[in-house]
A protein has these predicted regions:
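Long, acidic, intrinsically disordered low-complexity segments
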Residues: 43, 47-54, 248
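Outer-membrane beta-barrel translocator/receptor signature
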Residues: 37, 49-58, 63-135, 239-242
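Outer-membrane beta-barrel porins/channels
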Residues: 20-33, 96, 103-566
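Bacterial Sec-dependent N-terminal signal peptides
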Residues: 1-23, 562, 566
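Hydrophobic alpha-helical membrane-insertion segments
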Residues: 11-12, 68, 389
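Active-site-proximal flexible loops/turns
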Residues: 9, 66, 270
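N-terminal targeting signals for Sec/Tat export/insertion, comprising classic cleavable signal peptides
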Residues: 30-48
Length: 566
């Protein structure tokens, strides 16, 4: 069949988020505001004030301000106020923090301190739902148009359709698991009501429209697909990233404080989603629905190094300045999925249900993170803090594991190479993020404190970013979903209180976090762009545009910390 070969034929007309693809990995790169109740209550703006175990994971020099050893633990509850009722618990208990600091005097006014801590740096618990109209667009049409534009060619092997080179070491990488399901369960009908097909249906060629006999505006046999008039989507995610920190810090003459933290990370992510489209046939009559049910996990480990300093520029002033830097977190990850197409179509439409699964090992590296902070105290009654932090997520990196080699001495080294196509997508989708934190603590009595804080986190996603299913990438090949959301800025408001009695302390904090975004079930496609603007070849029937739906993520957290100084 004579085809137009198009390297990149999809244009996103709207904005859009959500395992090895850019949007999924972006969840691993960011961190929540979490830790001790004192730290959370002040909005985390303690990177210059220090003397809190949670600063071990932000500005390690904060541990250098301890004068007595301390142990503490934090637990609480999280709830999502805007979650739909889909049979999952909206409120969950959480163990958020545990830490220990040991102080050692090294001189008259100097200390060397050691600390260890655990913090749940990322909580993935979320329920996301969306419903919208499609006005003729559909997910299966996207799969068909990728085939039509030679992003993958089909052939039948062992009784099922696969990409033409899908059984050797050179598969058509844009051919993902969703394309496989639609090719085998829906688009290869022998007696079909597909748009673009005649009564003979698919005849086993490289393209899903091979038996149509109808030419399109480009002079090719028409692509075959079902249109849809609407969709329903839900996804429940769960899991966490646990951060384990090991710190050494100290101070010199109570004026300069330094710290170094080595961090280990434990990733546990899972989601279950269902995406349902209501389909119509070539006569635009309803024929039922199809559902893509997807279950995916991401697990693995990572590590980073953090360094920081705090100094008092004026000897007789309590004013402090804090500076810190975090290396990338180097993750070694594994993702697994099982995905099923469930057909509830009328008789004679489609070929029933179909399932697929996959596993993929890869590496993901987050960007460098830089921060600066100011702190000021008024006697023993008032503490004020402000922090600015920056990380450019477009510099995140994804790498494909390629096995390993043994050196002369028998040591094994794993080799990997950059996923260049997905790296380019990261550059287009993600952006630099600024985080601003301010907080205050007031003590009306020596043993009683009240705290308030606020955070602003700028958007991570470019407003024109999209999940590109056409990339020549293993991340695309193993992908099992097409949806994505472009989340906007995050706002957090915090409050808390603390009480000390002799060597014991108890602190309570509340946090409200709100983020809005725009959800898209799949990327949009323009046939006019595919034919380079040639109106004579343009076929409006091939356009596959979907509008975004506004979504939100509103979380409430209550956290309690018990501490003991000795």
């Amino acid at each position: 069949m004579k085809k137009i070969i198009i390297a990149f034929s999809f244009t996103m007309l709207g904005v859009a988020a959500m395992g090895q693809e850019t949007y999924d990995n972006a969840q691993l790169a960011s961190k929540d505001l979490n830790g001790t109740a004192r730290y959370v209550g002040m909005g985390g703006a303690m990177e210059a004030l220090g003397a809190d175990i949670s600063t071990m994971s932000s500005n390690p020099a904060g541990i250098g301000l301890f004068r007595r050893s301390m142990v503490s633990g934090s637990f609480g509850f999280n709830t999502q106020s805007d979650a739909a009722d889909i049979g999952k618990r909206k409120t969950k208990a959480s163990f958020d923090h545990a830490g220990f600091v040991h102080t050692m005097r090294s001189g008259r006014n100097s200390y060397v301190n050691f600390g260890v801590s655990y913090t749940k740096s990322r909580n993935f618990n979320q329920i996301l739902t969306a419903t919208g109209r499609l006005n003729g667009a559909s997910q299966n049409k996207l799969s068909s148009m990728k085939n039509y534009n030679d992003l993958y060619r089909l052939e039948k092997r062992n009784g099922e359709l696969t990409s033409q080179w899908g059984t050797n070491n050179n598969p058509d990488l844009p051919y993902n698991q969703v394309d496989y399901l639609y090719s085998n369960a829906l688009l290869n009908d022998q007696k079909s009501q597909l748009v673009g097909m005649n009564a003979n249906g698919y005849n086993g060629g490289n393209y899903l429209g091979d038996a149509s006999g109808v030419l399109d505006a480009s002079g090719n046999l028409r692509a075959a697909y079902y249109n849809a008039d609407g969709y329903d989507f839900f996804r429940g995610t769960s899991g966490y990233i646990g951060e384990y920190n090991f710190n050494i810090s100290g101070n010199s003459r109570n004026r300069f404080y330094w710290g170094l933290t080595f961090g280990l990370y434990d990733v546990n992510y899972s989601h279950a989603s269902e995406y349902t489209e209501r389909l119509v046939n070539n006569a635009q009559n309803p024929i039922g629905s199809v559902t893509i049910a997807d279950e995916r996990t991401i697990s693995g480990t990572g590590f980073d190094v953090k360094a920081g300093a705090i100094f008092r520029p004026i000897e007789d002033s309590p004013f402090r300045v804090g500076l810190y830097v975090h290396t990338p977190t180097w993750y070694d990850l594994k993702t697994e999925n099982r995905t099923t197409l469930v057909s509830k179509l009328a008789d004679g439409c489609g070929n029933g249900n179909k399932s697929t699964s996959g596993r993929y090992d890869y590496k993901f590296y987050t960007p460098w993170r830089f921060g600066g902070s100011l702190g000021y105290t008024v006697g023993k009654h008032l503490a004020l803090g402000a922090t600015y932090e920056y990380a450019d997520y477009s510099y995140s990196d994804i790498r494909v594991n390629e096995g390993g080699v043994y050196d002369y001495w028998g040591n094994y080294y794993e080799e990997s190479s950059r996923d260049q196509a997905m790296k380019g997508n990261i550059k287009n989708v993600l952006r630099g993020v600024s985080t601003v934190k301010v907080g205050a603590e007031y003590k009306p009595m020596p043993n009683l404190a009240v705290r308030f804080g606020y955070n602003y986190v700028s958007p991570m996603y470019n407003k024109n970013g999209y999940k590109d299913g056409t990339l020549n990438s293993y991340s695309t090949y193993y992908s099992s979903s097409t949806d994505y959301t472009n989340w906007n800025a995050t706002n957090r408001v915090t409050a808390g209180a603390g009480y000390t009695y002799k060597k014991f302390s108890i602190d309570l904090a509340y946090q409200y976090s709100r983020t809005t975004g725009e959800f898209f079930p799949f990327m949009s496609y323009s046939d006019l762009d595919a034919v380079n603007g040639d109106q004579n070849k343009y076929d409006s029937g091939y356009d596959n545009f979907c509008d975004g739906q506004k979504v939100s993520n509103k979380h409430h957290q209550l956290i309690l910390t018990l501490g003991y100084r000795f």
